């Protein structure tokens, strides 16, 4: 019953008009009035911001802020996979041969997430990682590895929240929400970077348009907190053992190691 009521409330409030109004407000100078309160409530680290709080003219500018030069370092080990974002490490695990994985008691289909069987087949038997970005986090997304961009595509229309309630009661938000996917071929092995939209504010702006990408290079930004899902081919990586659910991650921090193949 709670799941049904939750979904009904989301469907009634999560329409195009609501999203449009919220987006317009966030991009308006009027939104600057609540910037100080927003920064206080979400405990934004102002020491890391590229500009002072009063220099951000709208909430949108604050959401998409850049960091000061040198505030993040990218792990330089050739075999490392790095966190593409600042965020909270939610979960990782195996992708079953049936191209599904379980998180928070909910089963997700890679076929649904990527839009078709052919794309999903690459990741059967592989590994998934999920990182959640709260409204307080730096919202820009960087590449976790170097390689050639093979595909960029967008799927989904509406978005359920990706917080605890959304994960429990929503309609598989990681694979059904509005999402932007970038696939990268790195030394013959594939990785999918799935950028999942948040409720009301679906906007995910792509910044990278070249055919190649370097580890740590900026690729996109969210206009609000959301979630990133990483998919890796079978036997491609080994997740850093020290990683724990709920752990804070910083952009550029090593999260996995590429496995050597003879």
Swiss-Prot record:
<keyword id="KW-0865">Zymogen</keyword>
<comment type="function">
    <text>Catalyzes the formation of phosphatidylethanolamine (PtdEtn) from phosphatidylserine (PtdSer).</text>
</comment>
<feature type="active site" description="Charge relay system; for autoendoproteolytic cleavage activity">
    <location>
        <position position="86"/>
    </location>
</feature>
<dbReference type="GO" id="GO:0004609">
    <property type="term" value="F:phosphatidylserine decarboxylase activity"/>
</dbReference>
<keyword id="KW-0670">Pyruvate</keyword>
<keyword id="KW-1003">Cell membrane</keyword>
<comment type="pathway">
    <text>Phospholipid metabolism; phosphatidylethanolamine biosynthesis; phosphatidylethanolamine from CDP-diacylglycerol: step 2/2.</text>
</comment>
<feature type="active site" description="Charge relay system; for autoendoproteolytic cleavage activity">
    <location>
        <position position="226"/>
    </location>
</feature>
<keyword id="KW-0210">Decarboxylase</keyword>
<keyword id="KW-1208">Phospholipid metabolism</keyword>
<comment type="similarity">
    <text>Belongs to the phosphatidylserine decarboxylase family. PSD-B subfamily. Prokaryotic type I sub-subfamily.</text>
</comment>
<feature type="active site" description="Schiff-base intermediate with substrate; via pyruvic acid; for decarboxylase activity">
    <location>
        <position position="226"/>
    </location>
</feature>
<feature type="modified residue" description="Pyruvic acid (Ser); by autocatalysis">
    <location>
        <position position="226"/>
    </location>
</feature>
<dbReference type="GO" id="GO:0006646">
    <property type="term" value="P:phosphatidylethanolamine biosynthetic process"/>
</dbReference>
<dbReference type="InterPro" id="IPR033177">
    <property type="entry name" value="PSD-B"/>
</dbReference>
<protein>
    <recommendedName>
        <fullName>Phosphatidylserine decarboxylase proenzyme</fullName>
        <ecNumber>4.1.1.65</ecNumber>
    </recommendedName>
</protein>
<dbReference type="GO" id="GO:0005886">
    <property type="term" value="C:plasma membrane"/>
</dbReference>
<comment type="subunit">
    <text>Heterodimer of a large membrane-associated beta subunit and a small pyruvoyl-containing alpha subunit.</text>
</comment>
<keyword id="KW-0456">Lyase</keyword>
<dbReference type="InterPro" id="IPR033178">
    <property type="entry name" value="PSD_type1_pro"/>
</dbReference>
<feature type="active site" description="Charge relay system; for autoendoproteolytic cleavage activity">
    <location>
        <position position="142"/>
    </location>
</feature>
<dbReference type="Pfam" id="PF02666">
    <property type="entry name" value="PS_Dcarbxylase"/>
</dbReference>
<keyword id="KW-0594">Phospholipid biosynthesis</keyword>
<keyword id="KW-0444">Lipid biosynthesis</keyword>
<feature type="site" description="Cleavage (non-hydrolytic); by autocatalysis">
    <location>
        <begin position="225"/>
        <end position="226"/>
    </location>
</feature>
<dbReference type="InterPro" id="IPR003817">
    <property type="entry name" value="PS_Dcarbxylase"/>
</dbReference>
<keyword id="KW-0472">Membrane</keyword>
<keyword id="KW-0443">Lipid metabolism</keyword>
């Amino acid at each position: 019953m709670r799941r049904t009521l939750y979904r009904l409330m989301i469907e009634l409030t999560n329409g195009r008009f609501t999203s449009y109004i919220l987006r317009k407000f966030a991009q308006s100078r009027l939104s600057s009035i609540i910037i100080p309160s927003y920064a206080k409530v979400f405990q934004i680290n102002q020491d890391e911001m590229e500009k002072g709080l009063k220099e951000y003219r709208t909430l949108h500018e604050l959401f998409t802020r850049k960091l000061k030069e040198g505030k993040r370092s990218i792990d330089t080990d050739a075999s490392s996979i790095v966190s593409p974002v600042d965020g909270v490490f939610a979960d990782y695990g195996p992708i079953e041969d049936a191209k599904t994985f379980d998180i928070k008691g909910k089963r997700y289909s890679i076929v649904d997430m990527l839009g078709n069987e052919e794309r999903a087949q690459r990741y059967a038997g592989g590994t998934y990682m999920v990182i959640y970005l709260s409204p307080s986090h730096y919202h820009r997304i960087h590449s976790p590895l170097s390689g050639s961009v093979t595909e960029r595509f967008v799927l989904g229309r509406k978005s359920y929240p990706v917080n605890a309630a959304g994960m429990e009661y929503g309609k598989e938000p990681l694979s059904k929400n509005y999402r932007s996917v970038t696939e990268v071929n790195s030394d013959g092995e594939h990785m999918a970077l799935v950028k999942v939209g948040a409720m009301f504010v679906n906007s995910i702006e792509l910044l990278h348009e070249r055919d190649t990408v370097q580890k740590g290079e900026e690729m996109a930004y969210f206009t609000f907190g959301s979630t990133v899902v990483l998919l890796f081919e079978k036997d491609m990586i080994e997740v850093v053992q020290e990683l724990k659910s709920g752990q804070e991650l910083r952009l550029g921090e090593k999260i996995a190691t590429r496995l050597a193949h003879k």
